[in-house]
Design a protein with these regions (language model features):
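An anion/phosphate-binding loop that grips the pyrophosphate of nucleotide cofactors and donors
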Residues: 49
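C-terminal interaction surface of TIR/SEFIR-family domains
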Residues: 1-21, 64, 85-141
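Conserved TIR/SEFIR loop-to-helix hotspot centered on a Trp-containing motif
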Residues: 34, 58-78, 88-94
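Short glycine-biased active-site loop of nucleotidyltransferases that positions the nucleotide triphosphate
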Residues: 42-46, 95-97
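Conserved beta-strand segments of the P-loop GTPase G domain that flank and frequently precede/overlap
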Residues: 3, 29, 54-57, 83-84
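Hydrophobic anchor at the start of a short beta-strand
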Residues: 26, 80-81
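Conserved BB-loop
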Residues: 14-44, 56-67, 104-113
Length: 141
């Protein structure tokens, strides 16, 4: 699932397209549909996700809906990969700083390294999804 604040929609759409081409199934509100009830749509997207990729920015941190998605993902035990969308002048604080503390960020603020950073994101997603599948296999036995 791709969680983002709408100011970064064009960049996240580009990430969606690249990950999809690499074989990653992604959920993005404008691509996958939110449904009539935004909160039900968000909850379903998080509940059905193996990992939530949160595209962090100052406006993301200020968004009540982004906060709900990330907190619900954390409470549901869904893995999270933070992606930094801002330059070096901003860092997450408050609820977002707490939830992402200790996480390895992918940085998408530098356009010149976009493809390299997408490969890093792809590797992190593969690592988390692979670990989730291994846990499911063990619990099924």
């Amino acid at each position: 699932m791709l969680s983002y604040q709408w100011d970064h929609q064009a960049q996240v759409m580009r990430v969606y397209d690249m990950l999809t081409r690499l074989g990653i199934t992604c959920w993005m509100d404008v691509k996958s549909g939110m449904g009539a009830d935004i909160y039900e749509g968000m909850a379903n997207a998080v509940s059905n996700a193996s990992v939530v990729v949160c595209f962090m920015s100052e406006k993301y941190q200020q968004s009540a809906n982004c906060m709900l998605e990330v907190k619900f993902a954390k409470q549901s035990g869904v893995g999270m990969i933070p992606v930094m969308m801002e330059g070096s002048g901003w860092r997450p604080s408050g609820w977002l700083g707490l939830i992402t503390a200790g996480s390895l960020w992918v940085r998408l603020s530098d356009e010149s390294q976009f493809e390299e950073n997408i490969r890093q994101l792809y590797g992190q997603i593969q690592g988390m999804v692979g670990a989730a599948l291994a846990i499911e296999e063990v619990s099924d036995e």
